[in-house]
A protein has these predicted regions:
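Alpha/beta enzyme core
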Residues: 2-7, 18, 31-36, 42-333
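N-terminal carbohydrate-binding accessory modules
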Residues: 12-30
């Protein structure tokens, strides 16, 4: 960019002088309309479990979650993203509980849509909450995650959620071809209006630790890793190829995960494809901000709002954030 004019004729501070002019020239704005609130749901009645590594975040049974959903609706938050905490007795090598029509997720989806039909409900399509080994797919005898065999289970899982009333299914597993397989399954069953939010650029990040504690998969995964299917944090061009493939297979929206450490990817995706682009402010990002605020090192409100503004400035149309309720309250003034 070539600057026009010379100092003192050109003074950039002139438009920064007063609040009204700063507001008039503001390029990016955060509103409650961009928030998706991730929630952890567990079996039982009246149950609340604090997530130690995520201060302020709780695992909630359905009756408690309904109260949380009501608060979200009243604050104007458009959607919740559900993540189940599955009892260890239901975790198997074949992840059969993932497509149980009477399972936790379909029951929660049905209840949420019955009570709050205007609230968007997004479900996670992946097998790690359901496998005894904590991987996102089926494995062979060596522990390698099997791609094509996993697709069949993911398709059943997505259809199970759609038939329960999920507005959006969000495959986060990073198997090749899963968007096309899921779209075909949904279409064949007549679920043509179920949207797919593809975790297209999901990196094998170190920032997921608290989330795995929250859903109870950390212990199952142990010292294992997800390098053979999640993306290398060093790569950017690969992310564009992943997004292009998912869109060609039938994705309606795409996701970049994690968020703040990968805002360069958000910008590249938005510039290249100009499709609905979402980013996830993941558990590790949340935990870092919370820890700094609790130690008095950062102003929590100011830093949370600035971090969310960074997502918008990078090109994100929506943000999954554990700060959604707090941020919505902040924005009310």
């Amino acid at each position: 960019m070539t600057a026009t004019g010379n100092f003192p004729e050109t003074r950039m501070r002139r438009m920064r002088r007063d609040d009204f002019s700063r507001r008039l020239m503001r390029e990016s704005v955060v509103t409650v309309d961009v928030f998706i609130y991730p929630v952890f749901v567990l079996e039982g009645e009246g149950r609340i479990e604090k997530v130690g590594s995520m201060p302020g975040v709780e695992r909630q049974s359905l009756n408690i979650l309904l109260k949380t959903a009501e608060r979200a609706v009243n604050l104007g938050i458009p959607a919740l993203a559900l993540f189940p905490v599955i009892d260890s007795s239901l975790k198997t090598l074949g992840a059969e509980e993932a497509f149980n029509d009477e399972g936790l997720v379909p029951r929660v989806v049905s209840a949420l849509k019955r009570e709050f039909p205007q609230l968007g409900v997004i479900t996670d399509v992946a097998l790690d909450p359901y496998t005894s080994h904590g991987q996102d797919g089926l494995i062979d005898e060596t522990g390698y995650v099997l791609n094509d065999e996993t697709l069949e289970v993911l398709a059943k899982q997505a259809l199970c959620h759609a038939q329960a009333g999920a507005d959006v299914v969000a495959p986060s597993d990073m198997m090749d071809g899963r968007i096309g397989r899921i779209r075909a399954e949904l279409n064949q069953a007549g679920q043509i209006y179920t949207r797919i939010l593809a975790y297209s650029a999901k990196y094998a990040s170190a920032f997921y630790g608290p989330f795995r504690d929250a859903v109870g998969s950390a212990g199952n995964l142990g010292k294992g890793n997800k390098y053979t299917y999640q993306m290398d944090p060093a790569n950017t061009d690969e992310a564009l190829k992943e997004v292009a493939l998912d869109l060609a297979e039938g994705a309606d929206m795409v996701m970049v995960k994690p968020g703040m450490p990968y805002l360069d990817i958000v910008r590249r995706v938005k510039d290249e494809f100009k499709v609905p682009t979402y980013a996830y402010q993941v558990s590790g990002e949340y935990a870092m901000l919370k820890a700094a605020a609790q130690n008095g090192w950062l102003d929590e409100k100011a830093c949370v709002l600035e971090s969310l503004l960074a997502f918008k400035r990078a090109g994100a149309d929506g943000i999954l954030t554990y700060f959604a309720l707090d941020a919505a309250e902040y924005l009310k003034g």
